[in-house]
Amino acid sequence: MGQRHILHCDCNCFYASVEMQEHPELRGKSIAVCGDPEARHGIVLTASYPAKRMGVKTGMPIWEAKQHCRDLIIVPASYGKYQKYSGYVREVFNDYTDQVESFGLDEAWLDITGSVGLFGSPVKIAKEISARIKRELGITVSIGVSFNKITAKLGSDYKKPDGITIIEPENYKEIVYPLPAGDLLYVGAATQRKLGSYGISTIGQLAETNSETLKGWFGVMGYTLSAFARGLDQTPVAKQNAHTAIKSVGNSATTPRDLTTDEDVWLMLVLLSESVAMRMRDLGSKCNVVEIYVRDNELSGFTRRRKLDNPTNVSIEIARIAFDLFKRNYSWPKPLRGIGVRGADLCPADCAVQLGFFSNEEKREKLEHIDKAVDTLRQRYGYRSVQRAVVYTDPVLGGINAYDDHNIHPVGYFHTA
């Protein structure tokens, strides 16, 4: 098989760029697109480059961001608007290839191997895409041009904003080896710290470490890290359409106070699971995987996930699975500051269900009917018109409206372990 031609396109400061396009008076200013601006749990989802230069970062609580940048303009997130622009960007991609794999709303891989005969070299195609998105939508993109998905993403991260980086087998070591190990896809903060404890700080050092040694440190994931660091990745670009592009629905929050007990965590997981389940029902979807994200008060975090026997969009079922994942993986070494829930591997709500001798599908159907009735009441009378009793056990935590606050995070926000 010949060399593939893969692009990774990353819309720069996407949410902020969309807001500046819709509101020209914001251009050139320090802005942060955030969750609920009125509460401490509101966080920065995306910041403009002027704000970033002042130290404002994704995932930072609003109050902390304002300490870094006194003139920071807070803009509430508008998810529907970002979905619309994401669709516009995808239309440009589709003019060059039908092999487009979304990675969140603001990133995508394109396999243009079969397109070079029609449109010219990979670099020419990248330049055309960049110019069109800037001209037609007013948004800049950074593009990595390479021979697989992992290295293409490294390329898009290399020059921001509005850059194009070419990584080929011939210049791979020169460009990639000096980069921090944390720049590699799926190397989050916890993995980077563990690598650092073994004296590995760059991708080059990781590539030169024996794969069996890495397996001893990280299990089978060690083999993957070794391959990725050496530029080895045969993962195909997953062909998608409008109905398959959304693969997961997640919601997380930086809490109004530290979480210190299982009861605190259960309350938060109920709130977040309700939001995730409602959004899946809005999409006509169910999830086959439940994932949790946990971050302590020193900002160290991890994710854990569980594959389900049957897909679900039942709020309380997702909450119970998430809580069991938490209990099995956290023993309270520190208080928690952030927590999240994600439903992944989505399928249509009417997808086939595997029945067994001990199936609880009848009970699940009853819970689905209850959830739908609650959805109807909340749509008519407001989100707080119907609440679970646990919400009233803590007015501070229970005051979070996870669904309307729409704490929507870029994909990378969950990749911490």
Locations of regions flagged by a protein language model:
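Gly/Gly-Pro- and Ser/Thr-rich, intrinsically disordered tail segments characteristic of DNA damage-repair
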Residues: 1-227, 233, 237-240, 278, ...
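Short small-residue beta-strand/loop micro-motif enriched in glycine and branched aliphatics
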Residues: 73-74, 300-304, 351-352
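C-terminal hydrophobic structural anchor segments
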Residues: 323-380
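Short, hydrophobic beta-strand segments
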Residues: 108-114, 303-306, 353-359
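Short Gly/Ser/Thr- and Asp/Glu-enriched loop/turn motifs at secondary-structure junctions
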Residues: 103-107, 146-149, 285-289, 334-338
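DNA-contacting surface of Y-family translesion DNA polymerases
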Residues: 8, 183, 191-336, 411
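Short, charged/polar surface micro-motifs in flexible loops or helix N-caps
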Residues: 14, 37-40, 297-300, 346-349
